[in-house]
Regions:
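Surface-exposed interaction regions enriched in Ser/Thr/Asp/Glu
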Residues: 224-235, 255, 262
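Charged, amphipathic alpha-helical segments
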Residues: 7, 13, 94-109, 125, ...
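Short, cationic low-complexity segments
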Residues: 144-148, 286-292, 645-657
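Surface-exposed loop/edge segments in extracytoplasmic proteins
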Residues: 201-205, 271-280
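E2/UBC-UEV (E2-variant) core
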Residues: 276-317
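Structured, hydrophobic secondary-structure cores that serve as assembly/anchoring elements
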Residues: 1-102, 107-115, 119-122, 126, ...
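Autoprocessing Asn-cyclization modules and mimics
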Residues: 109-124, 130-227
Length: 657
């Protein structure tokens, strides 16, 4: 305690209740190509519905990534997904194909485009990809744009302007086109609703095309329209809102006016919902004033509203017909634009994902201090990427296992050669001189390989597809964590049942299983009446040891991660008897609990002067030695049946054979 120089009471609180924390070991990680969603950003997904809503429908180039993630979610509910994209992929924009660009995620947009550089037009799709070309944005920036009267204009009969006998007169029943004679059309836009006459009652017509001299509409006229008839127009989406935009109370109190606007986002081509024209989002009474906030302090400035709330678009620039948009409210009059904006986005593209992009995506999981991920699913990764995930992610983290599958070519429609080719893929090949011709998968206790692909129904496209099993393998581990503990083997008839299998690409028999298992490949086998089973629990470690089994590897991941996390609170304390005893009293109950849950046979914790010598203390180090006898899973069962004569005592023969 500090030295007090006058009487007083000083209260101190010392916390000596430190324990080993509980850790999650069921967090999956998946990197792949998708049709929609943020790029190079870790997104938490807890169910398949959210996966679909966030990353879009599985398609030809994306279904493997989608179902690898979806298959994991059939067993677990904690998955981090990273979408990767080719650097040549673009977001759809309202400024035309030549302005298309890649905005990978919210961070990139906020750092580069949020200030309104105006390099891509007024709006951009939230994420890159051709799917963004289905989006349409309509903005109603004033009361006039919401609804207005077009001035009386002479109308011509529907038909072709090249026809010589057009005269000023009535538009007849059945016409779907009107030519304007006199003042040019500056009041009606494609998409608007129109009525003829001084009333909004009666038949309503949808304008499908409009220019300065003519517009077409649907349905056809149900009655004659006389020349010089007044046209009543309404914004295309007027009925989606409670009234016209005007002046917000915030701006009114700042002596400004005309700051409100309505904005709506539509699935124009139906790629998001399957129904063209479906309204996706609408924003009512948003503001053009950059400082406008509601009573709760939430911004109403429409670029910020879109940034914080929209799932489909970003703002890029203001309507060029407006003035003062984006200014602060004080004494500001915002332009009363006469017509709404109707902007179809285009220029969005998808490109084939490169190996480099996939590796960069996996780099987002390499730092164990930044993100928690225990089960890494490789999808249809090739040999190079599979080794990268094992060596540069799992082994660097030291708290995760990478699950890989053989390539489709060696286990689908490769009848009779599957086992040999899978083993060649796993081990690589050498020539007659012993020189390596092709490298195989690295030897590592942080890697796990299955034997094939499964045939599965794709409900989104009403078809069947072959899919790698590594998503299911990781899922079995997540389910084992939930039903038992991480140190239980995920294989076998009790915990190794695989879901959503129509059939396997091949079904290894006993001889083939022997070939696979000796090379560290875990067979997946369909048994009549039993289902499809993971029939192994080996890691990719070639060296025979306890760590060539996944349950032991995951046991030590738990022990190392949990104890290390608790031990960091001993940093900068004194290496004395008290600190060492505190460490032992924290670790011992944790290991005793795991022993009681069948994870270890026995253990010992040594943290005293035998390993914390004077030299160790003087070098500012602290050593705790933890000895573990891990529990082993049963891989082989031998049943001996011995026939004994009636007169022979069992004591004479037991243990003799």
């Amino acid at each position: 305690m500090g030295f007090q120089v006058s009487p007083g009471v000083e209260v101190k609180e010392i916390d000596l209740t430190g324990i080993i924390p509980t850790l999650s070991t069921s967090t999956g990680a998946c990197v792949g190509q998708f049709t929609w969603g943020p790029v190079n950003y870790r997104t938490l997904i807890d169910q398949e519905t959210k996966l679909y809503n966030t990353f879009g429908k599985p398609e030809t180039n994306t279904y493997v990534s989608f179902f690898t993630a979806a298959n994991f979610l059939a067993y677990g509910n904690n998955l981090r997904v990273v979408r990767v994209a080719n650097s040549a992929s673009n977001n759809a924009v309202s400024g035309g194909n030549t302005n298309a660009l890649l905005i990978a995620n919210e961070q990139i947009y906020e750092q580069t485009y949020y200030t309104g550089a105006g390099t891509f037009g007024e709006f951009a799709a939230r994420y890159p990809g051709a799917k963004g070309n289905s989006l349409k944005v309509s903005v109603c920036g004033s009361r006039t744009a919401y609804a207005s009267n077009a001035s009386a204009q002479a109308v011509l009969l529907g038909g072709s302007l090249n026809t010589a006998n057009h005269v000023i007169g009535d538009a007849k029943t059945g016409n779907t086109k009107i030519f304007l004679n006199g003042s040019a059309n500056t009041h009606v836009k494609a998409g608007d609703w129109i009525h003829f006459g001084n009333t909004s009652r009666g038949t309503k017509y949808k304008v499908t095309f409009a220019n300065l001299t003519m517009y077409t509409f649907t349905p056809a006229l149900t009655a004659n329209v006389a020349a010089n008839t007044v046209i009543q127009r309404q914004w295309e989406y007027y009925d989606q809102f409670d009234g016209a935009p005007g002046t917000s109370s915030y701006v009114l109190n700042k002596f400004g006016k005309n700051d409100e606007l309505h904005l709506i986002v539509v699935d124009e081509n139906g790629l998001f919902t399957g129904v063209p024209g479906t309204v996706l989002e609408k924003y009512s009474h948003a503001s053009k004033a950059s400082d406008n906030k509601d009573d709760t302090g939430t911004s109403k400035y429409y670029p910020k509203v879109l940034f914080e709330q929209s799932k489909y678009i970003y703002w890029g620039d203001h309507d060029t017909n407006g003035t003062n948009w984006g200014s602060e409210a004080l004494n500001t009059t915002f332009t009363d634009v006469s017509l709404p904006r109707r902007l179809s986005l285009n220029g969005g593209t998808d490109q084939v994902v490169t190996a480099g992009a996939l590796q960069l995506g996996w780099d987002l999981f390499a730092n164990a201090d930044v993100v928690d991920a225990s089960l890494l699913m490789a999808g249809d990764a090739d040999l190079t990427l599979s080794n990268y995930i094992i060596q540069s992610v799992a082994e660097v983290r030291k708290d995760a296992v990478a699950f890989v599958s053989p390539p489709r070519s060696v286990c689908v429609n490769n009848i009779g050669s599957e086992a040999d080719d899978v083993v060649l893929y796993r081990n690589g090949t050498v020539d007659e001189n012993g020189d390596v011709v092709t490298a195989g998968l690295t030897s590592s206790s942080y890697g796990f390989m299955d034997s094939g692909w499964k045939y599965q129904y794709d409900k989104y496209n009403d078809t069947y597809r072959f899919l790698p099993l590594n998503g299911d393998m990781a899922g079995l581990c997540a389910r084992t964590d939930k039903t038992r503990d991480p140190w239980f083997s995920p294989g076998g008839f009790n915990r190794g049942q695989i879901k959503n299998v129509v059939r396997m690409s091949w079904n290894p028999g006993q001889t083939e299983r022997d070939v696979l298992y000796t090379s560290g490949v875990n067979p997946v086998v369909s048994f009549p009446g039993e289902g499809t089973i993971l029939y192994g629990d080996k890691t990719l470690q070639t060296k025979p040891s306890a760590f060539d089994r996944i349950n032991v590897r995951r046991l030590f991941i738990i022990l190392e991660k949990a104890i290390a996390r608790a031990a960091k609170y001993s940093l900068f304390e004194f290496n004395d008897e008290f600190t060492r005893a505190q460490f032992v009293s924290m670790v011992d109950p944790f290991l005793r609990d795991i022993q009681g849950r069948r994870g270890i046979f026995d253990y010992r914790v040594v943290c005293d002067t035998t390993n914390n010598t004077g030299e160790v203390i003087d070098s500012n180090r602290f050593i705790g030695d933890i000895y573990i006898k891990p529990a082993r899973s049963i891989n082989f069962i031998l049943l001996n049946f011995v026939a004994v004569r009636t007169g022979v005592s069992f004591d004479e023969v037991v243990g003799k054979f």
